[in-house]
Amino acid sequence: MESITIENYVFPSTMVNPPGSTNTFFLAGAGNRGLEIEGKFVKFTAIGVYLEESALPFLAAKWKSKSSEELANSLDFFRDIVTGPFEKFTRVTMILPLTGKQYSEKVAENCVAHWKAIGTYTDAESQAIEKLLNIFQNETFPPGASILFTQSPVGALTISFIKDDSITGTGNAVIENKQLSEAVLESIIGKHGVSPAAKCSIAERVSGLFKKSYADASVFEKPGIEKSSDPVIEEKPTIPEIGV
């Protein structure tokens, strides 16, 4: 598997022992998040989504016969990624500067609206949102800084902040709430996901992995994160509906 470059930021093909996990992850896909502003598409963040190695056989059982186009258009496929019994790791790297308050308030707004709509907003979720807002309150993220989310299938969400490319050590904070843990990734690749480009990338890469023999194709290569100076040409994604 190859790495993916978004706006000169490289997402390596594998990730080993990110904060909150001792597992190895493969890069499922990556893309930008942006908005149309005065007729110009402005990119704010680059997002990479990694899945624990056990995700591939789990997803293949149901989706291996589907084309990349079918996967890209299937809400159930992305829902299976969000809720599947394996760990997920998401890296959100700033292309433009952003404050923690700006980021967390938008995430919180979207989560609460979704939970209220489906009738699952309880005191536990309210407390989890309050913790999220407090964690981000005093943070600032210049270009190149990243927010890291490690999502456990049992419900723990490990949050980390890095100013460079070193993804090591323990997380800054852990929130024990399964709905919030899933909602963070849902907000990126779900029905109203903020990165259609990442969704298309995931569908294409995972479909390609399904077509390879597990015996012959290793999705795990030497990990590493670096910044590339090579220009990257990307297709303009569909404009996201909501979120940060």
UniProtKB/Swiss-Prot annotation:
Q: Which residues form the signal peptide?
A: none
Could you list this entry's UniProt keywords, alphabetically sorted.
Flavonoid biosynthesis, Isomerase
Pfam families for the chain:
Chalcone
- Cite the binding residues for substrate: 45, 110, 187
Site, Important for catalytic activity: residue positions:
103
Which transformation does this protein catalyse, written as a reaction?
a chalcone = a flavanone
Q: Give the E.C. number(s).
A: 5.5.1.6
Please give the name of this protein: Chalcone--flavanone isomerase
Naturally occurring in which organism (per UniProt): Nicotiana tabacum (Common tobacco)
The beginning of the lineage is: Eukaryota, Viridiplantae, Streptophyta, Embryophyta, Tracheophyta
